[in-house]
Amino acid sequence: MTLKPMIRTTLRFAVALSALAMAFASTPSAAQTQGCNVVVQSDDALRYLPHAIEVPRTCKDFTVTLTHSGRLPVLAMGHNWVLSKQSDMAGVARTGMLAGAENHYVDPSDRRVIAHTKVIGGGQASSVSFAVSALQPGETYAFFCTFAGHSPVMQGSLVLQ
């Protein structure tokens, strides 16, 4: 390999690495809440942004608005936002699958579910509010999608501040 192609390859690598670093640097690790509200973004790539939410204990109620910026319809790539204790996540996801689409993949009688949105498709949004008093200091909470097979990769954490 001569010097010019090596320099060109090195420059391409450096540009790609810089772009990747900037993408991760601009991804928030914890949600910047607007008072007692947060917008959680989802898309066709099976992810939530942000991955972590901090709920101020001064809020009486907290509202989560789930948006889906993807293009696929609800039947192909639907998402919801479900909140439970971290320790209950697997069980809630399992019973949610059995509850089916007509129940937005959430068992309506499951007391482990603290809050959940409807299942939405590309271009849609859904909101849910819950009492902050339902959260316990020091407890670990998870939010996740209970649409078919999404919960193993589509999840995040929520803490009471």
PLM regions and their residue ranges:
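Extracytoplasmic/periplasmic copper-protein system
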Residues: Q32-D43, S84-V106, A148-Q161
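Extracellular/periplasmic metallocenter environments
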Residues: A115-Q161
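Short, solvent-exposed loop/turn elements at domain surfaces
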Residues: L46-P50, L72-A76, A90-V92
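Short beta-strand and strand-turn-strand segments in soluble, beta-rich domains
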Residues: N103-A115
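Bacterial N-terminal signal peptides that target proteins for export
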Residues: T2-A16
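C-terminal segment of classical bacterial N-terminal signal peptides
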Residues: L20-S29
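N-terminal edge beta-strand
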Residues: Q34-D61
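Beta-strand cores of secreted/periplasmic/IMS beta-sandwich domains, seen most often
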Residues: A52-A76, W81-L83, S127-Q136, T140-Y141, ...
